[in-house]
């Protein structure tokens, strides 16, 4: 929770100095122990200002989603060199799944940030879901009926 300290115009130099000594970054350890139990003088005009209210949801869905996005990103960092060193169908399908999921989550954040209005946002998310499903199906079709993602990239590099 962000807390700011505001010093009103009523305080003089002593009030400003006392505020600096109360800041954990500035005060030495021996002063810190001395000031722990002393109350803040109300006449000095020091106030707590709470910038953001604490909204805690009961589910861990957002945290798990954020963690899984980072896991897929790190997985891609290892999967790309592994696919170059060992091109096989397992790598092709793993790349198809990871790239599609990574793109879906990334474009989903773009839709969330830049598409406004409930109906328009629902339509954009439905379109994104359809696009992601078609992308995954197309990559799986390409892996099964053609050379696969790894060999296709290698053929492009030979050009």
Swiss-Prot record:
CDD domains: SQR_TypeC_CybS
Effect caused by changing residue 145 to N: Found in an individual with features of Cowden syndrome; uncertain significance; increased manganese superoxide dismutase expression and normal reactive oxygen species; no change in AKT expression but a 1.2-fold increase of MAPK expression
Mitochondrial intermembrane topological segments: 86-90, 145-159
Keywords: Disease variant, Electron transport, Heme, Iron, Membrane, Metal-binding, Mitochondrion, Mitochondrion inner membrane, Primary mitochondrial disease, Transit peptide, Transmembrane, Transmembrane helix, Transport, Tricarboxylic acid cycle
Paired cysteines (S-S): none
Domain of life the protein comes from: Eukaryota
Record Gene3D superfamilies: Fumarate reductase/succinate dehydrogenase, transmembrane subunit
GO cellular component: mitochondrial envelope; mitochondrial inner membrane; mitochondrion; respiratory chain complex II (succinate dehydrogenase)
GO molecular function: electron transfer activity; heme binding; metal ion binding; succinate dehydrogenase (quinone) activity; ubiquinone binding
Transmembrane domains' residue ranges: 64-85, 91-111, 123-144
Disease linkage: Pheochromocytoma/paraganglioma syndrome 1: A form of pheochromocytoma/paraganglioma syndrome, a tumor predisposition syndrome characterized by the development of neuroendocrine tumors, usually in adulthood. Pheochromocytomas are catecholamine-producing tumors that arise from chromaffin cells in the adrenal medulla. Paragangliomas develop from sympathetic paraganglia in the thorax, abdomen, and pelvis, as well as from parasympathetic paraganglia in the head and neck. PPGL1 inheritance is autosomal dominant.
Role: Membrane-anchoring subunit of succinate dehydrogenase (SDH) that is involved in complex II of the mitochondrial electron transport chain and is responsible for transferring electrons from succinate to ubiquinone (coenzyme Q). SDH also oxidizes malate to the non-canonical enol form of oxaloacetate, enol-oxaloacetate. Enol-oxaloacetate, which is a potent inhibitor of the succinate dehydrogenase activity, is further isomerized into keto-oxaloacetate.
Name of the protein in question: Succinate dehydrogenase [ubiquinone] cytochrome b small subunit, mitochondrial
Highest classification ranks of the organism: Eukaryota, Metazoa, Chordata, Craniata, Vertebrata
């Amino acid at each position: 929770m962000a807390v700011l300290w505001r010093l009103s115009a009523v305080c003089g130099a002593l009030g400003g100095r006392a505020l600096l000594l109360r800041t954990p970054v500035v005060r030495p350890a021996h002063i810190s122990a001395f000031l722990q139990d002393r109350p803040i003088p109300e006449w000095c005009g020091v106030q707590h200002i709470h910038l953001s209210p604490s909204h805690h949801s009961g589910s861990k869905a957002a945290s798990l989603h954020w963690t899984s996005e980072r896991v897929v990103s790190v997985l891609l960092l290892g999967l790309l060199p592994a696919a170059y060193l060992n091109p096989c169908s397992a790598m092709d399908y793993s790349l198809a799944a990871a790239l599609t999921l990574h793109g879906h989550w990334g474009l989903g954040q773009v839709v969330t940030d830049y598409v406004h209005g409930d109906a328009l946002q629902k339509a954009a998310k439905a379109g994104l879901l359809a696009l992601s499903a078609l992308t995954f199906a197309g990559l799986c079709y390409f892996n099964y009926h053609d050379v696969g993602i790894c060999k296709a990239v290698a053929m492009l590099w030979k050009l």
